[in-house]
């Protein structure tokens, strides 16, 4: 049964998925969505429904709906029908149709009374009103919609149509869906209208409050026409905003220069006679006039200049006779016809360009010339072009197919019928393709194994290594193309030689002579439609020697097995690539070819060389022609402050027009207007609404403000809450609540009535709709399921997990109990409860309610309260309803269709508890003080009372003793006497009282008749008398008491007073006992808090103890590891480089030299000279890792050299052996690590040392051979030709000394095994270069810098980053390639980094790729940075200077030290082409500072002759034109006194953007100072005025730049000046990527050597050897050998063949059999073992495995990603080839 149920359920799910994914459902969904795209068509539809009444109104309604539906049907049909789609889906339909039609309706209908729009006769057809309504709704439905744009929906349709098979079904279903949505919408509109008409509550309760609003609804109904006209006007305005009207905008001038006037503006499209060859649109021939628009859009190849030049060839004499005698027109006859038709299209063309050109002049999206981009239009082209191509042997749609290739292939197919291929079955094609690839792979494998066998048989290196193929320019002269232009060397990234035509007049005779020797390729002939039958008679094969390809040093023959091509392919190949040589005697051919003319076409382009009004004011226009500013800037005026009338001589040499112009340098300021700037740098004529995004904050932000970088922003409290203000508001609200309570009661009564009415209305509306109850019921059921089983359990899990994280006990049981208690009861539509599972009958149609009993509310905690407390709560608050009804939105209501009630907040009890805790803390903190205060007051009162009682008793006893002593002279002893004394005292008191009363009575009897005043006086006198008597008596009693106190006992004397004291104490104690309860509670609470805090702190204390214990264990382990590492370092004596110079300890200082790269190059140079090589010895050397980075073991190398007889390490002979430079280069190129680009070579110290040694040894060594002297002559000749000064910093004597030192140092490096070493070499080098640099340029701290290992970056002054500007160029006379290295101020630090740093190793590898990143770093202060990664380098270097070497980190803006020394030289008469092309700034004074430059020579062959004279003329023309253009541009520019000024100006204007930040007060101060400066500059004696302005306070001295050496660094530290560089894209070639990738994965051990001053921790990781070392870690592996220095067998093949071999292996991975694939590759590996070691197996030898894997892995990884993905498949993600790498390499076991 269970299986059956699951089967049914699975079928239902699959059925539902099929229904959802079906075409009909998707079409319905799309159609339903289109109903929401409400456009202007709905205005007419709604007007017909609202306004028209009667019989004619119903007809109008019907016509409006039919027209509306018909228009929508046309839109849906246009999806399927392409012509209709092109007509309706273009944006110009809005411009042509919508706006005039809308405006016509608005102005036509606005003057009429819309409500009285009816006609007199019913069926009158002359009015055509019903037809107009139909047309309105039909036409307006075709317009683009604006509430929900239809473009989004159209894209959805196109996406689905692309993968949909049954397209017509999709269109019909979408139309049906739209129809359903439209019906629902119109029903809803009808219900709204009926509700407005029938609802009396609007007039009675809501709107009509007085007689004023009595007729509001009627007026609203009557003014519907006006409302619709207003809506129509708003629509017109909206479309006007979207459609830029070209009538009211200013038209800019377009550039219409022809391309033939300038040489550099020609595009290599001579072969293309039709514009359709290079355009993607493939227009018809009669649309050639519109091609200019397509070219402007950048879809073809556009060069860097602003004109576009198309060269086509055609024949004026188009009539030529065929063999049949018929006449035919040529293929370019249409030009003549088009010229005739142009006169009729004088109106059509501007109208078309006005309407349809979306990139017209009033669009602000044109490109503007700046310092980086100087093109009219960027070469932007879509990377997606769909075309069929073969992939994996099958025809597939490629989305990155070259469009030019596809058009060319289509043309060839049309012209040549043999190109049309028969379609083969896909299986046959794939098998054929796989067989070809398998054959290629086998051939490569054989060649690879043959080369390995040759290596094993110890052949010479020339026979083993495959050399690169170079393109030969001239075979007899053995001239090759330069490396940058050679397609075999550079592939896709190669350059393109532009052979520019000479300026010479070609006469008819010259043309006829030249035609005799001309030849035409057959491909050109096919495209030109020339008569082939005549040409085929004169076919001769191409002389292949003229285009021969020489393979240099290829010692292996081609594979014997060649592919057998079919006859058709051979014929096609011959037909295409044979050459037709014209015969001079054939007059027809001469006629055809002599009449070729060049057609130059003017292409209109909008000007892109625009300048702003601000630039025009500042005078920064580079051209002589005055230009109108094309960009609107803020309103400003140029105020000239100072004019320098001293003339500056401008000297230009070797030019046609030498002129000395005097210019007056003006110093001007720009004064802006105070009004706000609304121009925002907008282009003149463009629309303001369509401008680019404008900056609303600062133009250049010092810090990031985007939410994307929120984690990098300093965490600050952006919002501050006013707590006291909130408290005041709360208190004021509480006070006002009582007053508002009565008002609230009345409002509640009214609200309840309104709520009831609203519930009834909602219930009725749900009943009125057709499918409303179905939708509502399904939504309710889904909401109940979501609430019960998804949302609430998730909330429970989150809550309890948070409690566990906060170290609190979870409440799973309580929450689950409450959750299970919640019940969802299904009810009828009226609210009758049924059960949890039972649904009411017909609930989908009749409706349903869901009642929730005991709704679950998430609580932060559960309190265990007693039953009494619960009953108390119920009595106080009343019984709360434990049920609610569920709404469609998942909310809760008390009644069905009621308003949603608020749920009890989860965070409210938390906030209450927090408030309670805070209040308790406050009360407890002050409770102790209160108690102490109360106790203190009680104690003081008690003491006072005791004191008063004692005094009273004492006085009383004393008086009584006196009385007793008077009456009884007997000694008073015993209690009896005291008792008698007390009785006598009482009697006396009573007698006194009676006497007093009697006296008063007598007096009152006697003086009844007397006056009041006399009585008062008498009473006062009597009282005084009585008081006196009493005082006397008391004094007597005191005396008696003192006399008789000795007779009384002490115990009996204080019995009665002690009783009274006890009573007072008893009273006070009861009070204390009553208040002591609070004190006890306080103590108990404090104890409980302390215990609770202790329990909470237990896990924290335990974790802290755990971390501390682990930390101590780790510290001990690290300390032991460090000790072990130091011991191992002490034990090690292995030296990997043959030329590593030992650190020599002298008495004064320790100097160590590192010329590892020099000696390595020298050893390879020696090895390349071996004429009779014995590779049995070389094999032993290969085992010890020579071929990659040459870490030699000294003893074995020494023995090998002794046996070969190359040199002896004891014999100090300076004679060098003979060699060719090319062999040396080829040896280096065979190792791909040395085959780097020129920029990478220039950055390496290796290349520079090699160059210095070559140059200096050639000049000074007397024992050179003839060949070396020839090289010397070549170098000297080059110096004479280009007037190049090799080293202008040093004099000839210094050069002589330097050369001898280099020579000696080179010699010493070979004999580095000697124990003694001449320290004078190091001192001489140090003095020669370090001191030269430091003293020449006046750098402070010379003595400290010389002998430092780590140079402090704050000492030196460098303005630019360490980037070398290298411009490769070709010397046409010798065909040599030079690199002009422009050395700026910042580059001279190289001399310090080479020699001055003693222990710093100049290694081959880039230090983990950090060189490139630090060279490309920003020019800014690090306090204001965009990305904190750059800040890391600076901060780590400041703390630990050993992290980054000195040459890698030079900060940019440090203390400015002016260069005072200048070297003067005379201007030469001839400016070399090198200086013309590279130097940007000329120094026009007699004194100028030279910048040192370096030249790098690369000679390809020995005997190279001068090239042709045409190339020389071209080179001269280029030089002259370049010099003219540069000097013309510099005429209006500011001239500089030194190169430092020029560089600084270039830096500030071209390469950076700066920004000043200060407050308004500081700004005002500066402005006041500037105003004073403007006056002072003009005066001859400004002292008096300056002093007076200072006294008046106009000029403030605190902001003056008083310091002489005031630098930008201080301003940047303070944050006033912010300088950021312009972000430029850096283009890296593939070889540099290889170099950087290997540099990341392989880290040299010498990188981690440190000085004794800074000790570094070394960690050994034996388990993870393969891990790449990150940039910020230094990790050394303790091994006996360097595992990455070994011979890679794969380097036997050339890089091209190597890639081909790998790719063929990758293509073979389609078979899902990884075992076979690995076994094949393992076989290759086993064959390779013979190279590395014959005796040992590769699998067993762990070291060789690690070596093999560590080198092959980065090679494969890099080339797979960079070459295959990026350039071939146009993907940058490497996931596609991850499985290839997994299958390619097995995991080697590590023991």
Swiss-Prot record:
<feature type="compositionally biased region" description="Basic and acidic residues">
    <location>
        <begin position="1498"/>
        <end position="1511"/>
    </location>
</feature>
<feature type="transmembrane region" description="Helical">
    <location>
        <begin position="68"/>
        <end position="88"/>
    </location>
</feature>
<keyword id="KW-0150">Chloroplast</keyword>
<comment type="function">
    <text>Involved in protein precursor import into chloroplasts. May be part of an intermediate translocation complex acting as a protein-conducting channel at the inner envelope.</text>
</comment>
<keyword id="KW-0934">Plastid</keyword>
<dbReference type="GO" id="GO:0015031">
    <property type="term" value="P:protein transport"/>
</dbReference>
<feature type="transmembrane region" description="Helical">
    <location>
        <begin position="176"/>
        <end position="196"/>
    </location>
</feature>
<feature type="transmembrane region" description="Helical">
    <location>
        <begin position="227"/>
        <end position="247"/>
    </location>
</feature>
<comment type="subunit">
    <text>Part of the Tic complex.</text>
</comment>
<dbReference type="Pfam" id="PF05758">
    <property type="entry name" value="Ycf1"/>
</dbReference>
<keyword id="KW-1001">Plastid inner membrane</keyword>
<keyword id="KW-0472">Membrane</keyword>
<keyword id="KW-0812">Transmembrane</keyword>
<dbReference type="InterPro" id="IPR008896">
    <property type="entry name" value="TIC214"/>
</dbReference>
<keyword id="KW-0813">Transport</keyword>
<keyword id="KW-1133">Transmembrane helix</keyword>
<feature type="region of interest" description="Disordered">
    <location>
        <begin position="1492"/>
        <end position="1511"/>
    </location>
</feature>
<comment type="similarity">
    <text>Belongs to the TIC214 family.</text>
</comment>
<feature type="transmembrane region" description="Helical">
    <location>
        <begin position="91"/>
        <end position="111"/>
    </location>
</feature>
<keyword id="KW-0653">Protein transport</keyword>
<feature type="transmembrane region" description="Helical">
    <location>
        <begin position="133"/>
        <end position="153"/>
    </location>
</feature>
<protein>
    <recommendedName>
        <fullName>Protein TIC 214</fullName>
    </recommendedName>
</protein>
<dbReference type="GO" id="GO:0009706">
    <property type="term" value="C:chloroplast inner membrane"/>
</dbReference>
<feature type="transmembrane region" description="Helical">
    <location>
        <begin position="19"/>
        <end position="39"/>
    </location>
</feature>
